Amino acid sequence: MGLTGRVRAYLNQWWRDIAKGADLVDLARIAVSEGATALKWYPFRFLPQHEQNWAVRPIEVQRAVDEVAAVRAAVGPNIDLMVDLWRRLDRAAAAQFCMQVAPYNLRFVEEPVMAENLEVLSGLARQSPVRLATGERLAGRQEFLAVIERQAVGIVQPSVIRVGGITEMRKIAVLAEIYGIGVAPHNPVGPIATAASVQVCAAIPNAVMLETYANGVPAVRDEFMSVNLLLDGDGFNVGTRPGLGVEVDEKALKRLATISGSARP
């Protein structure tokens, strides 16, 4: 596409050091001081992985709400905040959460319930004063169309590596635009997918923000790039280089392919 311009990004993984005992509120302040203007995190991360949606207690919902309030108080009103609930709630608990966080002006609440149940998701969307978002598990425009036509969310989150590439993601964006729905691509993966997602966001009118893990991934993810697209403050500069604007160092890639271990954040 080769467009010029800038794509705004929201930061994920800024909170990762809480596993080492760091304070979430302090980490939010640090991320903002380093240039982030939009932050996303997982306020129900404390729940056991096996806990079922219907087992979540009101006190656990309140704990998550209190965390949102604390982060908002720390970063002020001008920073966009988003939360990913990772499908941990049923409709009643999700409605309770969305109502209670309304005063804190979240940009969106991601996957509050199982997205496969469109009846529940669209019903929650009608109740919620906060935009809902989903899409990272959907593959192709047909699956997105079902969500979009039901007005089940205010923001869709296609992943360029899951939906089938740039062309398919742009078609999904067109469908969303018809219904007044924004696009905030899911992007926890590597530099090539990031570059592709940036190009799509630069080419569509309903791009909201692009997810980035730029501050929380192993360096090995970028070591095979001879020309890379790096986060600059709160976004990516599209630039004028041909293609995706990045180049792979094939020798480095072959070397890294022999190293064992995980490149996951």
Language-model features: locations:
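Structural signal for hydrophobic packing residues in well-ordered secondary-structure cores
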Residues: R72-V75, N105, C201-P205, A257-S260
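N-terminal amphipathic alpha-helix/helix-capping segment at the start of soluble metabolic enzymes
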Residues: M1-V7, L229, F236
